[in-house]
Regions:
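Short helices/loops that flank or line small-molecule/ion binding pockets
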Residues: 33-36, 89-91, 101-116, 120-121, ...
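Glycine-centered hinge/linker elements that transmit conformational signals in sensory
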Residues: 69-100, 138-142
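C-terminal capping/gating helix-and-loop segments adjacent to ligand/active sites or protein-protein/ligand interfaces
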Residues: 153, 213-284
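Short amphipathic alpha-helical coupling segments at ligand-binding clamshell hinges
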Residues: 30, 81-85, 166-178, 276
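A structural signal for short loop-to-beta-strand junctions that line the ligand-binding cleft
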Residues: 1-18, 42, 138-152, 242-250
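Bilobed periplasmic-binding protein-like "clamshell/Venus-flytrap" ligand-binding domains
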Residues: 2-3, 40-48, 181-193, 286-292
Length: 292
């Protein structure tokens, strides 16, 4: 047991259901297939090499690095596919925000952006995202090796017990008190409570407010967010059931620097993909073994 959070939210990539299917979970090969199907579209609105690289590596970086055994896998086909996809985008410095910026809803609706990043901390957030796309969407998750859904939970208010503590019983009592007295309407509460009784109470409270609605605008796109419905609740519970990991930054900054430094030669056409991934593999392996 590492910690007991008091609240959580959900973090995932989403796309049109017609593009990504109805189930969560996909691989880098699946992402590449989507890109190949829509060669004129971007994966994300206002995408740059940096944003695409970080998004596609954020949840699955550990699959390329085995710190315990000092082994790296940056010469595998999945990583090569990743760099091939990233190569089509401008660098962060090359992207002209004044000239090239497009609001996400406009990019989604025109099908010039295929994916969005969705953060769920309220029962109606899924409804909001679906209306921004103006089409049925699927929480496809971040790409992995195929063994996971790629849908992650972000935790808040985590409490834990020091293994050297001489007062573990008292610590457990404090944790129990914290969970039981975590008020669902507290101004300090973000996302959803982890205690089922509190979660159910929150859902009941939201359903009781079903007649409430509010307007939401993003540039020239305006939508109406309806009060919580049973459909919203069902979609939320289904999404929670798909969560299979914690949203944490797996990326080692030094390894990311190695990747971005060496990949630049491929992006500029100075070296082949195989040459670049071989160099990344070599440098990364040396670094991991020196720091494991």
């Amino acid at each position: 047991l590492y910690c007991v959070p008091t609240g959580f939210s959900i973090n995932t990539l989403v796309g049109r259901t017609e593009d990504v299917g109805e189930k969560s979970g996909w691989t880098m090969a699946d992402v590449k297939a989507l890109c190949d199907k829509y060669p004129d579209a971007s994966l994300f609105a206002n995408a740059t090499r940096g944003t695409v690289l970080n998004a596609l590596l954020s949840y699955d970086f550990d699959s390329y690095v085995d710190w315990e055994n000092g082994v790296c896998h940056f010469d595998q086909e999945e990583f090569k596919q990743l760099l091939e996809m990233v190569a089509k985008y401008p660098s962060d410095d090359e992207f002209d925000w004044e000239k090239d910026y497009v609001a996400e809803p406009k990019a989604f609706r025109s099908h010039t952006a295929l994916l969005g990043t969705m953060y769920i901390s309220d029962v109606t957030d899924y409804q909001v995202e679906e209306k921004l796309f103006d089409a049925p969407i699927t929480a496809i998750g971040y790409p992995t090796d195929g063994s996971r859904s790629g849908v992650a939970a972000s935790i808040s208010g985590g409490v834990c017990i020091n293994t050297a503590s001489k007062n573990k019983d008292a610590c457990w009592e404090f944790i129990e008190y914290t969970l039981v007295n975590n008020k669902i309407d507290s101004i300090f509460m973000y996302g959803f409570p982890v205690r089922k009784a509190d979660f159910d109470a929150l859902i009941e409270k939201k359903l009781a407010e079903k007649d409430s609605s509010y307007g939401y605008s993003w540039d020239d796109v305006e939508i109406t967010v309806e009060g919580t419905t049973q459909e919203d609740v069902d979609k939320l519970k289904d999404l929670i059931s798909r969560v299979d990991g914690i949203s944490v930054n797996q990326q080692d900054s030094n390894l990311m620097n190695i990747i971005t430094e060496e990949a630049e030669a491929y992006f500029k056409g100075q070296k082949s993909l195989d040459d670049v991934t071989s160099i990344i593999q070599s440098r990364a392996t040396i670094y991991v073994n020196e720091n494991k």
